Design a protein with these regions (language model features):
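Residues lining hydrophobic/aromatic ligand-binding pockets adjacent to catalytic sites
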Residues: 2, 6-7, 18-30, 114, ...
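Short catalytic/ligand-binding loop motif for oxyanion handling, primarily in non-cytosolic enzymes
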Residues: 18-19, 56-58, 108-114, 118
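Glycine-rich, phosphate-binding/catalytic loops in enzymes
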Residues: 27-29, 119-122
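Short, surface-exposed acidic-centric catalytic microdomains
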Residues: 27-69
Length: 172
């Protein structure tokens, strides 16, 4: 029986399943093989995070910004869906595994690590569709997404601190 690597990498959900992204945002057909194959070949164990946006709003959601997700209800939702993941990671760490990295998605309002998505203006959707409202532009800005902030705090509370959060830049 081969020895275990005891190395764990935590992945944002869409790295393994692009189908949870907002429609129109997929830049690969299913799983992000360019990022995942090297991890698998190196023998890393993979823990997939749940997709907070999909579990909160479903598949037929609009793209949103960090300002729209930064609410007490969404943060509570993030903490609730993270609880079993944190329990698993704590159990793995207690069993001698090393949680090396969390791979997020830069530019995401939820899973951004170095950059998130900002730019909420508000208004009625009919005005935006009909062109009667000012154009609303989302921009990338430095900072963590809401889910990554909650994950980082939950990891710290569980005593899992010696790991890196890495933002995978899907914009190229």
């Amino acid at each position: 029986m081969p020895d275990r690597s005891r190395e764990i990498v935590v992945l944002a959900h869409c790295h393994l399943n692009v189908n949870t992204k907002v429609h129109g945002l997929a830049s690969y057909p299913g799983a992000r093989t360019d990022a995942l194959l090297p991890l698998i070949e190196a023998g890393a164990g993979i823990v997939q995070l749940p997709c907070p946006e999909a579990t909160y709003l479903g598949m037929k959601r609009w793209g949103m910004t960090v300002e729209q997700y930064d609410t007490p209800a969404y943060r509570r939702h993030c903490r609730e869906i993270l609880a079993p993941v944190i329990d698993t990671l704590a159990a793995l760490a207690a069993d001698g595994c090393v949680i090396r990295n969390v791979l997020g998605v830069d530019g995401s309002p939820s899973c951004g690590v170095a950059e998130t998505c900002s730019g909420y203006c508000g208004g009625e959707i009919e005005q935006i569709v009909d062109g009667d409202a000012p154009a609303q532009r989302a921009v990338r800005k430095p900072g963590r997404g809401v889910f990554m902030e909650e994950l980082e705090e939950a990891l710290r509370s569980a005593g899992i601190e010696d790991l890196r959060l890495i933002g995978f830049n899907e914009a190229g």
